[in-house]
Amino acid sequence: MEDKEGRFRVECIENVHYVTDMFCKYPLKLIAPKTKLDFSILYIMSYGGGLVSGDRVALDIIVGKNATLCIQSQGNTKLYKQIPGKPATQQKLDVEVGTNALCLLLQDPVQPFGDSNYIQTQNFVLEDETSSLALLDWTLHGRSHINEQWSMRSYVSKNCIQMKIPASNQRKTLLRDVLKIFDEPNLHIGLKAERMHHFECIGNLYLIGPKFLKTKEAVLNQYRNKEKRISKTTDSSQMKKIIWTACEIRSVTIIKFAAYNTETARNFLLKLFSDYASFLDHETLRAFWY
């Protein structure tokens, strides 16, 4: 099956955002509503609310100079079970972030159904050191109403962040991170559900660029202070419901978290952005509302 292509480009001209290119084919669906906000919003969806076995989706996005783009979804992206004889469901996203531009990939979590097989690849290329990016990659355990607990066949998510080298066609890699969830019987380490220790939501948040400089410093300082590292993002009733860690690698701040329920994860992320990235419009945090 050939890749289903999609393209999207947004430019900022005299402080006004214009969508200059948008194209998609089934099963991909793109919506860029007109708003009075000082940034552009792109909803990435699929017909039926999910991806079926064998789907292969490829989307290219360009965020022009000085532009701000918030990429969202309308609800969880469902991953349906793999049909015998069909290849893994695949989704590829390539994003270029221009000079002094900001890209926010803050979608709802992916929801893999039982026996699904999914490979996600997300590549981000920053124009220079003035480009900023917030990338959230998170997933759920399955469908709670039928007691699915990490019963997908395989879930793989690959993230790569690069920056262009001035006066050169080359790029330097700032981050490569891969999340793999599958059973490994040969290692005798237990099934996926056993290894996840009842966590229902796990994810990674990556921050880079000058627009998140203060955010990154605040998050890292909070984490270093072990006695107070949870106090500003979770109250005492939530301390046992979520665990998280933070570090910085080649100017990319990485926040990894695991929560016992989705609501706790949403609240954690909402508080984190509200406390440490208050410059973001509340509309950009729609994925954390509940």
Swiss-Prot record:
Cited Pfam families? UreD
Q: Say if the entry is tagged with keyword Cell cycle.
A: no
Spell out the InterPro entries in the cross-references. UreD
Q: Where in the cell is it found?
A: Cytoplasm; Nucleus
Query: Which one of the record's GO molecular function terms can you name?
Result: nickel cation binding
Family recorded in the similarity comment: Belongs to the UreD family.
Q: Return the GO cellular component terms, semicolon-separated.
A: cytosol; nucleus
Q: What does this protein do?
A: Probably facilitates nickel incorporation.
GO BP annotations of the record are: urea metabolic process
List where the protein spans the membrane: none
Signal peptide feature range: none
Q: What is this protein called?
A: Uncharacterized urease accessory protein ureD-like
Arranged from A to Z, the UniProt key words for this protein are: Chaperone, Cytoplasm, Nickel insertion, Nucleus
Q: Which HAMAP family match?
A: UreD
